[in-house]
Amino acid sequence: MSVTSWFLVSSSGTRHRLPRELIFVGRDECELMLQSRSVDKQHAVINYDQDRDEHWVKDLGSLNGTFVNDVRIPDQKYITLKLNDVIRFGYDSNMYVLERVQHRVPEEALKHEKYTSQLQVSVKVSAPKRGDALPDHTPYCESSQPRPEKGDRRHGAEAVAYRTPLYGQPSWWGEDDSGAPSEDRHQEEPYSERPKDLAQQNGELDSCRAPAEPPDYSFRREPSYFEIPTKETPQPPRLPEVPTQEVPTKDQEAGVGGTAPVVQSHASFTIEFDDCSPGKVKIKDHITKFSLRQRRAPSKETTPVETVSAETKVADWLVQNDPSLLRRDGPGDDRHSTKSDLPVHTRTLKGHKHEDGTQSDSEDPLAKTASVSGASAEASGEQVRLQRQIKRDPQELLHNQQAFVIEFFDGDTPRKKRSQSFTHTPPADPKADKRRGPGTSDRDRPGVSVRATGSSSGPQRASSLKREKTEERLGNTSPVPRASTRSFGSVGRRSRLAQDFMAQCMRDSSPATRPAPEKTPPVLPAPLTPRGASPVTPSTTPPPPTDPQLTKARKQEEDDSLSDAGTYTIETEAQDQEVEEARRMIDQVFGVFESPELSRVSSATFRPVIRGDKDESSDGGMAQRMALLQEFASRAPGMAPQMEQQSLLVPGSPGGQKWVSRWASLADSYSDAGLPEDGPGRRTGEPEGPLPVRTRRLLPQLPSGRADSPAGLEAARRNGPGPPELGSEPANCLIGQEDLDPDSLSDASGSDGGRGPEPGTERQEDLAWVRGRRSPRAPGELVPTSFFIGDQNGEATFPKKSFVGPGEVDGPGRVVQTSPSARDGLYVSSNGRMVIQLRSGRSPEPDPAPPKETLTFARQESFTKEPTSGPPAPGKLPHISSHPLLQDLAAARASRLDFHAQDTHLILKETETALAALEARLRSKSADECDGGSTPRPPEDSLSGDSDVDTASTISLLSGKNGPSPTTPQTPGPQKESPLSPPTVPDPGGATPGSARERMSERQHRPTPADLGPGDTSRRAAMRRGHGSRGSLDWPEEERGSGLAHLPSSNHETPEATLAGRQGPRRKPAAPPPSPAAREEQSRSSATAQKVQQALTRSNSLSTPRPTRASRLRRARLGDASDTEAVDGERGTAANPEPANRAAPEQAKKLTRLDILAMPRKRAGSFTGPSDSETAPARTGFSGRSAELYSTSRKPTIAEARAAAKKAAATAANTGPRQPFSRARPGSARYSSNTRRRQQGSDYTSTSEEEYGSHHSSPKHTRSHASTATQTPRGSSSTRARSQGPRDTDDDEEEPDPYGFIVQTAEIAEIARLSQTLVKDVAILAREIHDVAGDGDSLGSPGPTRSPSLGNVPNTPASTISAREELVQRIPEASLNFQKVPPGSMNSHNLDQNMNDSRDDALTNKTRPRNREEVIFDNLMLNPVSQLSHAIRENTEHLAEKMKVLFQNTGRAWEDLEARINSENEVPILKTSNKEISSILKELRRVQKQLEVINAIVDPSLNLDLLMGNRAPSGSGQPGLGKARPAAQSSTSPASVDTLLPALPLRSFPQRANCGPPGLPEPAFLPDAERFLI
């Protein structure tokens, strides 16, 4: 009889049969259980329409949504699923493809009394039955024929098993009783994922799977749900015997005519009677190798054999299926179903069970246990092999004519279930056997084999994928690599006996051999290359299996990989699986997985790379598969050369970062599209890619060497001693990477990641070279990971896999895109989803591969600070990718840099253009991703939002690419030189490109207070300038801010000169393209970027990663503005730096000030780092996230974004320090902190760099720059630096004078407005920062109120009071030091009030138009605020250190602190018209006080060196604050502001000095501020 069955085939190849009833999908107690933490407990419902024979999916209002074809479906609304629809639940790395299979139940089987009774029993024990069927089916993945066969059996068994699950119970309910069915089902799920992936990758899967499915479906589905298959069913199935024989494809590829091939289940299905569970019958398609393999090869001609086989096989299976013998699936079956029934599966789930009781699909304890089976290692290995083969290689089983799988199930220890298979047929394929040689190994790394095979044969890939995985485990140890033709081991698999023997042998020998495969899959010995290594099989060769325990561990890992879907695969070696898994899951969640390579190397066992790939399960296997994939990029853990092609590893490749969290892998899971790009390697990686796709969400991998995801070229070039190593094509990417390199940790990587080699490949190569030489870390040295979130379209996708630099220390763990194109180095998902390029490395220069082009936003937030070991070549601008937009930006940036030297405004405009280009790239990527069915946003958010890593970094990367990236590569030397030599101004055009980068670098390296002497005004100005567009770490921006006042006069030329000099030296290497051309290019880029940004925004909004705590806090603070929304808006707005470009996004996504402010904050405030310039140092100091986020903050619409950015910059500056300290988040607060240091001047001045450079030109220009710089440059120093140019231009465009030098009045007005906005933003951000960062309890308390009312920081009583108190405290200090702008301060306050009015009409509309005084005052106020924030940050930092040292003292310290803080709060509110500023200052003061108290408490005697060091710089300001506080409180806002500015700079300066770069500019800032005020 023919039955139609619907299956959800997961990217891992696991097939889930969809019952004709409503099933729940979720993490807990659901019929379809996913392990991804992004999947809600009850995420979605899949219902069945009997009339139309179609399934519906309805999202149950899940947090992360359900995506059909990468489009998020509305909640609570049924969406009809069509054939081949791709469904994703939350950010589960598994994508499920809906497939339909027409299954014919073999007449023989149905007639068979035993079978019928078993079916009936199965119906009773539906769960077990289904489980059985599933595993059976899984084997079919190996070959299309086996798959149908599996389908047949599976249909019967699964149908019964999957009869109608009780509501709330998984359909496999009861499977655990038999254990085998559960295992089958568990396996099925992973396999389904894999086939689905395969299907996505190849049509093969469909073809292979479809036929398999049809038989499976018909047989299984009808009987299982509606009736116990009786003898009626057998006859129809019997008919399709011949067709069944043929390799079933959806098309019935083997020639089954038009009808779906009816796979006769005679050999297809095994009926296992489980003695353990009386009612349980497992119908498996691995009945006998008897005919399965034959059928497969001679699909059509197999009919006769099949006919005979049907009966024979039924009999054989009945014999074999002695419940005890065939109880292969034991608790392992639960693996598949473990997802829901914890109680039942507890034993089974042991070691795989997640805390929530879910078990990853690939966490098949049974299989693992089988491998490990203590009873008999051999039996265990054999069992694993057999199980894997059975599940995955039914055909192979059939191929071995008669394979009797006898499973010895240890009832007491399900995991110890051993299966022995006796094959009466001579070994069919030594290769297959080898491939499967060590059953356990193969099982351990199913992904490897599957991937390898997948590449070799499309059709097989789908069905084989899983099988191969199993096989790989089974046959890893096999000496002979599996033939490529037998993708999944269905080709020439040895007899079970031979395989078992091989498994034993391999087990004996594997311990020695396994490490090699782990390290160098490509180099694996032939035995080690059963799958991946064999040339036929493009995929990486599976590592040889190791001892049974290792095999078991590997098997578990494989299982874990399978469950990667939403779960964190935990690879367990021989260690306690539960413990290992728990650890790994935790690590994954935190993106801290040891590099798979490392772990692999460390553990002989091939540990699955936890990268969210199904293949991830087995490191070796995956690594091997990857090896083929990335043969050149062999990601062997042992491969020290980062240049190894590993960088080409597919993001999803097993080599991917282990650290990839499932969330990260989610993003990775969409790197399928990119995979194919690699051609055979890629293709090989394709299965890998999809698998990775499902799990691959790489969190930054610190330990691994830099992974330059771009092609190995990029990796090589990065690793290469010099630029020559870089390939010309990758060179572009390299530039991007290089751009990132200097500050790759900081925003530089991220922001610049999106930019292609703007000046040229040469520059990128230089950058790569410089980066290589400047980064001290050895090639093998781990590089800080950078995430690039990009799209295929926008090459800036996050390479899901970390791009392994030359060494690819990550090796297997860090899968780099296999695609040769370095630009696409970021692995792009086939869906066009952004791939996360995870470049992990300790090196401060994660050098996020820019392979993705502009879109590749390197996640700047590397976990390690990038030590700018060598000055990156100035020409080595951080061009993250060679994306055309980026390239355009490169030219634009070069020109912009020239403009920078020439005109800060132009630079700003250029920066905006660059931002626009980045945004365009992002948007285009986003669009592509959307088209591809993937959304870059989830990966971005995912990285940032899903993972503990702050979402800001990802968002910032996407949105701004945060200009810092270009700066990042800047050579510290050139940077410093640049500021040192204002004369470089003459070299604005030529030096500009270099200078921007150098500025960033400079900012990074310049942090030394000595670097920027107060006397070195020009140099300081230059620094400021450099920092301005990129956001300066130092106070240059602040100096700029103060300089803004005096800039027009004395520092006026110096800033420009310095800026030019600075930029010139920095960007000097980059050929300065004609500013007009560059600008045009940038404009184009901007337009494109806008689109990209919009697309990204859409994508982000479409599939946003699960919000992190910070994002939730932000959301709560922001109210309706959600993290994603804020980021999207921020991105959209910021991404459109140019007025036109910007207008659309700006208007389209008009962000409220709060939204804008929240954006950087939203991005965990990590990226709140003032700007790229800030980001670079910030990143260096912290992650780049704050800066990048900040960047994003500044990216909003020119006016709004500018103001908001200004505010955000100020606020971020305030927030940054605070947040970093309050919030331990490195990416969020710390980045912000450094950023804020630079930003304090720049943000508050808002024109630190821009105003500095532009102020000398013209107030208006300064104004524009201020806003733009604050928004854009601050946000993304390098990208922003580019953006700044464009934005400046935009500002200019907004204002008649393009350069803005002429229109001083307009600029002043603009400045006033921006200052107003900035002040408000600062207040708002301060509130939010307090809330989120919880810097101080006092801050935290006001934070919530503050956060909601962006404009009403002062309005909010708590926040206002806190802020005001802080202001009062600070302002008195400031007043004492500086009382020169009473009118300005008043105006500033008025302006601020205006801002408030704009935000809240409640605030009196004071002078909306601002005078220069007002603007200056605002800047001054903001500068103090920024400085205050910086001081707070410093204090907090020191405090944190001290507390670490003296945590035991914190108890009493906190009490004292509380008292002191409370007393501080008592400080009278500053009487200023600018309530926001007052509140901000007060809050900051309060926070600082808290920090001071904490410091005092921690080290009351101030004995600690940290304390002393902090006190010295911090104390200078703090004591003054304390003393000045009363005066400030009493003093009015003007005096307070005036006083505050000087005092704060002084105060902040010491702190900054402690911090390093920020401190340097501060002295200059004070003079600047004074001058400005004067």
UniProtKB/Swiss-Prot annotation:
Residues 452-463, 475-488, 857-867, 950-959, 1084-1102, 1265-1282, 1344-1358, 1385-1396 have a biased composition (Polar residues). PROSITE patterns: FHA_DOMAIN (PS50006). It is found in: Cytoplasm, Cytoskeleton. It comes from the Eukaryota. Residues 518-528 have a biased composition (Pro residues). It holds the Pfam family CEP170_C. Residues 23-73 form the FHA domain. Residues 370-382, 1134-1146, 1199-1213 have a biased composition (Low complexity). Residues 147-157, 182-197, 325-344, 430-446, 465-474, 996-1005 have a biased composition (Basic and acidic residues). PANTHER family: CENTROSOMAL PROTEIN OF 170 KDA (PTHR15715), CENTROSOMAL PROTEIN OF 170 KDA PROTEIN B (PTHR15715:SF18). Plays a role in microtubule organization. This is Centrosomal protein of 170 kDa protein B.
